[in-house]
């Protein structure tokens, strides 16, 4: 069997200005091909998360955003209020290598939250869809 995704990716957005904004932000993160590719590669690239949030057109201030990656292997904070954090790359790799990963985003601007689900983006997915013709 060929799989297009190997892991479940959950994005939780909390402390947003509104539930609608939180939903748009979370959906943009799990829908981003760059985030999906980072999850496949177990790459703790929080810049891709903020980039996807920017594409959402939802209101947020990047300088307030904190990001952590979580799984059964632990949790690693990578960004605090828009600034990079020093973090253990080996731990981040372990956290992101699990089959279920959560991208925890705190926008630090309100009280609303939302969650969205997606998956990673694998070589097989690209191959299948690159070869597919209607």
Model-derived regions: residue spans:
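Internal helix-turn-beta structural module
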Residues: 15, 23-27, 31-134
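Oxyanion-binding "anion nests"
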Residues: 1-21, 25
């Amino acid at each position: 069997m060929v799989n297009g995704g190997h892991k479940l990716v959950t994005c939780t957005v909390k402390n947003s200005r509104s539930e609608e904004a939180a939903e748009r932000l979370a959906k943009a993160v799990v829908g981003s091909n760059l985030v999906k590719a980072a999850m496949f590669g177990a790459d703790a690239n929080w810049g891709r998360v903020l980039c996807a949030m920017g594409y959402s057109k939802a209101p947020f201030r990047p300088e307030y955003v904190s990001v952590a990656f979580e799984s059964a292997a632990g949790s690693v904070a990578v960004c605090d209020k828009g600034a990079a954090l020093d973090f253990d790359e080996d731990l981040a790799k372990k956290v992101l290598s699990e089959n279920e990963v959560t991208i925890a985003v705190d926008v630090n601007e309100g009280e609303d939250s939302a969650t969205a689900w997606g998956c990673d983006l694998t070589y097989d997915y690209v191959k299948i869809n690159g070869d597919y013709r209607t």
